[in-house]
């Protein structure tokens, strides 16, 4: 019950948006999952596995993209100056570590300008789709209990930290 309560409280205080720049491919036949194709467009609000439904816009810089999506997440979470957050940048499959780190830096700078503190973070390929270009930005409003739990050691088959 305690774990379910904490997980629900986390879900209630977290928001995410996926930005897709290239389509995923099927692992058996290499065919594209989507219809974005080779364009100069990106899709904001696409499903993590290439599902459509987002809005297609001309490709933007990292700073412009982060400003667009982080602003939407901040509004959804009703973040304000002094709030503490967890930020996760998840690559969609074909996004390089360098690209994810640039996106993370731009996210931290965006939040810092609003006096919103990033107290913990994760950057990497956590949930991916074969050859999909893009990223998922997750922001969660955290309290002291979430921070304490994050700092605790964790050892599981899928994730470990000391």
Predicted regions span which residues?
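Mixed-charge interfacial surface used for oligomerization/domain docking
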Residues: 2-101
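C-terminal non-catalytic interaction/assembly regions of soluble proteins
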Residues: 72-162
């Amino acid at each position: 019950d305690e774990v379910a309560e904490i997980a629900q409280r986390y879900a209630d205080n977290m928001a995410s948006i996926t930005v897709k720049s290239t389509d995923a491919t099927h692992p058996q036949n290499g065919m594209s999952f989507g219809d974005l194709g080779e364009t100069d467009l990106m899709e904001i609000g696409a499903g993590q596995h290439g599902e459509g439904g987002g809005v297609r816009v001309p490709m933007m810089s990292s700073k412009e993209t982060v400003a667009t999506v982080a602003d939407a997440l901040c509004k959804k979470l009703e973040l304000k100056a002094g709030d503490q957050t967890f930020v996760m940048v998840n690559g969609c499959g074909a996004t390089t570590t360098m690209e994810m780190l640039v996106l993370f830096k731009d996210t931290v700078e965006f939040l810092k300008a609003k006096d919103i503190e990033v107290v913990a973070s994760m950057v990497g390929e956590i949930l991916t789709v074969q050859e999909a270009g893009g990223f998922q930005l997750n922001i969660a409003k955290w309290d002291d209990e979430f921070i304490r739990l994050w700092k605790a050691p964790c050892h599981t088959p899928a994730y470990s930290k000391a």
